[in-house]
């Protein structure tokens, strides 16, 4: 029996490196080995690609537990030491033997169209979105513009380039205070997992938050805080789409930040979301609208703020490679829709191998 070879890409150069490893471990455990041959491909923080060998060893590590019991820095050091000890050369595999790639690369250099473009050039089908949708949705500011153009409500915001802020920080402070009211959120535009996001409650906190975000990204979004529940929808499909039931996150801290997600595990998840049924249907319709407007394929998780007292639905962001960790919403939402984890990976691989309408041979 022929087994389709799936290259599971994980790690990567972004600040979400360790989260990618946790996601990949869950994906690897839920791919049907009777149907697929999995080739683990680990990408180091400095861009080295390693297949098999040390990549397989890293997948066996319980990275989530390592982060909780030691630290993020110690975990990163462990991964570096494992690669060095293996003495394997990077780029030790041939793309020609791969039938489909399954990138579980969160953040820059993985979720932003770069890897998707490489795979497309090599004519290797890839799970999830293509180059354009991946690049567009990686930029929170551009995503909001596209969502608003599609008729979705978005939070009021201002965008600043990091170099412009360093040149004249006071101009940015004046613009933010004149355009928005407190509380605000300051966000690097291209990072996920809530990395670098700060909630700002007063003008005295603004400079530190923007400086921090500018140290992580070339562009920063300063956004009006939105009242409402954090509601998420999983979407799957290419031409024919399916939206999951709505899920809700109740943060364990002021907002659903990196530590709340992956270290303290204090957030509460509710499926279905605690909003009326008719409002849930409107959120699901809005998720499908965003998915289509942004040109998504394969999968995405679409996030909103929902106020059940006013019926307000505000688009927040879309994740084209959502988390697949044990605490991640995307696989949980798909399970609530009747698609278990192993069936989910199978569907995503099959969707990747469908030809895109209008694509040249």
Curated annotation (Swiss-Prot):
User: Quick one: which residues bind Mg(2+) 2?
Assistant: 317, 319
**Binding locations of Mg(2+) 1:** 303, 317
Which classification does the entry list for the species?
Bacteria, Pseudomonadati, Chlorobiota, Chlorobiia, Chlorobiales
The protein's predominant localisation is cytoplasm
Q: What family does this chain come from, according to its entry?
A: Belongs to the D-alanine--D-alanine ligase family.
Specify the protein name. D-alanine--D-alanine ligase
Q: Which UniProt keywords apply?
A: ATP-binding, Cell shape, Cell wall biogenesis/degradation, Cytoplasm, Ligase, Magnesium, Manganese, Metal-binding, Nucleotide-binding, Peptidoglycan synthesis
Among InterPro entries, the record links this protein to: ATP-grasp (IPR011761), ATP_grasp_subdomain_1 (IPR013815), D-Ala_lig_Van_CS (IPR000291), D_ala_D_ala (IPR005905), Dala_Dala_lig_C (IPR011095), Dala_Dala_lig_N (IPR011127), PreATP-grasp_dom_sf (IPR016185)
């Amino acid at each position: 029996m022929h087994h389709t070879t799936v290259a599971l890409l994980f790690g990567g150069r972004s600040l979400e490196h360790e989260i990618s490893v946790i996601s990949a471990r869950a994906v690897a455990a839920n791919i049907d080995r009777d149907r697929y041959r999995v080739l683990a491909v680990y990408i180091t923080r400095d861009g080295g690609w390693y297949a098999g060998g040390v990549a397989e060893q890293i997948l066996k590590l319980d990275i989530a537990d390592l982060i909780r019991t030691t630290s993020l820095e110690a975990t990163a050091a462990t991964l570096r030491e494992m690669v060095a000890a293996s003495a394997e050369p990077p780029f030790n595999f041939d793309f020609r033997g791969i039938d489909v790639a399954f990138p579980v690369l969160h953040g820059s250099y993985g979720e932003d169209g770069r890897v998707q473009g490489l795979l497309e050039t090599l004519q290797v089908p890839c799970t999830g979105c293509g180059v354009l949708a991946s690049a567009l949705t990686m930029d929170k500011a551009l995503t909001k513009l596209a969502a608003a153009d599609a008729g979705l409500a978005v939070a009021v915001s201002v965008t600043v380039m990091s170099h412009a802020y360093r040149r004249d920080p006071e101009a940015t402070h004046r613009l933010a205070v004149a355009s928005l009211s407190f509380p605000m959120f300051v966000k690097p535009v291209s990072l996920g997992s809530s990395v670098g996001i700060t909630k700002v409650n007063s003008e005295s906190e603004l400079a530190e938050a923007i400086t921090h975000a500018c140290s992580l990204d070339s562009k920063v979004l300063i956004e009006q805080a939105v009242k409402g529940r954090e509601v998420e929808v999983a979407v799957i499909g290419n031409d024919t789409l399916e939206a999951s039931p709505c899920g809700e996150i109740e943060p364990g801290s002021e907002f659903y930040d990196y530590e709340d997600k992956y270290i303290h595990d204090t957030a509460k998840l509710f499926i279905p979301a605690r909003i009326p049924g008719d409002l849930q249907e409107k959120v699901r319709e809005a998720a499908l609208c965003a998915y289509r407007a942004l040109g998504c394929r394969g999968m995405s998780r679409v996030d909103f703020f929902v106020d059940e007292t006013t019926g307000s639905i505000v688009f927040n962001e879309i994740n084209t490679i959502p988390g697949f960790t044990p605490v991640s919403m995307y696989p949980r939402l798909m399970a609530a829709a009747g698609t278990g984890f192993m069936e989910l990976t199978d569907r995503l691989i099959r969707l990747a191998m469908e030809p895109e309408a209008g694509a040249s041979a």
